[in-house]
A protein has these predicted regions:
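C-terminal active-site subregion of NodB/CE4 polysaccharide deacetylases
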Residues: 67-73, 77, 81-169, 174-180, ...
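A short, conserved beta-to-alpha structural element at the edge of catalytic cores
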Residues: 189-209
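Core hydrophobic alpha-helical transmembrane segments of single-pass membrane proteins
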Residues: 38-48
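Short beta-strand and adjacent tight-turn residues that come in two discontinuous sequence segments
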Residues: 195, 221, 281-283
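Non-cysteine beta-strand/loop elements that form the S-adenosyl-L-methionine
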Residues: 107, 216-221
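C-terminal region of N-terminal signal peptides and the immediate post-cleavage residues
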Residues: 48-70
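Terminal targeting segments of Actinobacterial cell-envelope proteins
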Residues: 1-33
Length: 327
């Protein structure tokens, strides 16, 4: 026994052996593995191409077309994306917009929902389901909502509009125009025109600002919503010019269009509107708005009993008359 061992300590501690190093694959093995992996990727890509090409049709142009069910899914996703973004897609001209100098339909809405008991004008309350269905119907038929300012830019300054433009106007400033019309139009990527009376509306200042931020146009509807044809010259000027000044001061945006309360106007009222600096004015004359009548712009009033069928008939009738008249 070696002399340096100690009986009390026993045998000296032995260090564990290190595991043996594994020998790495050779260069040839590495190359073979890479080739196998590459081959697998190619097979997967080819399979995906075959599946995609077989799922679509052909529209005669050599481009695959989506199955109808796929098209609906894409449309639904696009609509949801517009709503989530909160952005208005028609705020600026799109690639398919074209010069337009012909008539344009302007729809006229008031309140949305069920009329309260004792309401003197229940016909002005369009059901919310009806309103949503009308917006869906318009989009399905290719209509795109724009503001009146955009129409005037196309009419008088060489601007462009969608192939089937339409203006959605909302009078007076009812609360559901903010709580329901605003989000509904957002789903379609559209904006409306708010014809706001300067005093006495149901909308808060923050509501109006939110609508403007979403791309809506702000138009004047007098201060107190009075019949202008029954007022004297000074009162007319106060209601017409004064409402524009109030709205521009409160919301810091251009207010270039006017809406006659209850559609009432005469030569003196029209003159006051022109002198106040407005570009145009909407009426309750039934029909399409025409470029040659900037201060007598016709509209299609949508009432509680209009529904989708009535809207479709109104648009079809007016389009037919426009075509017959050489539009």
């Amino acid at each position: 026994m070696p002399s340096d061992w100690d009986d009390d300590e026993g045998m000296p501690e032995m260090r564990p052996e290190r595991p043996a190093r594994r020998r790495g694959p050779s260069r040839g093995q590495i190359m073979r593995r890479r080739l196998v992996a590459l081959g697998s990727i190619v097979v997967v890509v080819v399979a995906v191409i075959i599946v995609l090409s077989s799922s679509g049709g052909d529209d005669g142009s050599g481009r695959p077309t989506a199955h109808p069910s796929q098209a609906k899914k894409v449309a639904h996703k696009t609509k949801a994306k517009k709503a989530a973004s909160g952005k208005v897609t028609n705020a600026t001209p799109q690639a398919d917009w074209v010069p337009h100098r012909g008539p344009v339909p302007i729809l006229e809405y008031h309140d949305l929902g069920s009329p309260p008991e004792g309401e003197p004008y229940p016909e002005l309350f369009v059901g919310r389901d009806d309103f949503a269905k009308q917006m869906d119907w318009l989009e399905e038929r290719g209509y795109e909502a724009v503001t009146l300012e955009q129409v005037q830019e196309a009419w008088y300054h060489g601007g462009k509009l969608p192939p089937k433009p339409i203006v959605l106007s909302f009078d007076d400033g009812y609360r559901p125009q903010f709580t329901f019309a605003l989000p509904t139009l957002k789903e379609h990527g559209w904006a409306g025109v708010l014809n706001l009376k300067a005093e006495g509306s149901d909308l808060y200042e923050s509501n109006v600002k939110a609508m403007i931020a979403a791309g809506w146009e702000l138009a004047a509807h007098t201060i107190h919503h009075l019949d202008l044809t029954e007022l004297g010259p000074e009162e007319v000027e106060e209601e017409v010019a004064g409402s524009r000044k109030i709205l521009q001061r409160e919301y810091d945006v251009p207010v270039d269009n006017f809406c006659y309360p209850s559609g009432q106007f005469d030569e003196a009222v029209v003159k006051a509107v022109e002198e106040a600096g407005y570009t145009g004015a909407t009426t309750e004359i039934s029909g399409f708005a025409e470029r040659g009548k900037p201060f007598e712009l016709a509209r299609l009033e949508i009432l509680r009993e209009t529904h989708v069928g009535g809207l479709a008939a109104d648009l079809k009738n007016e389009e037919g008359e426009t075509a017959e008249g050489g539009g």
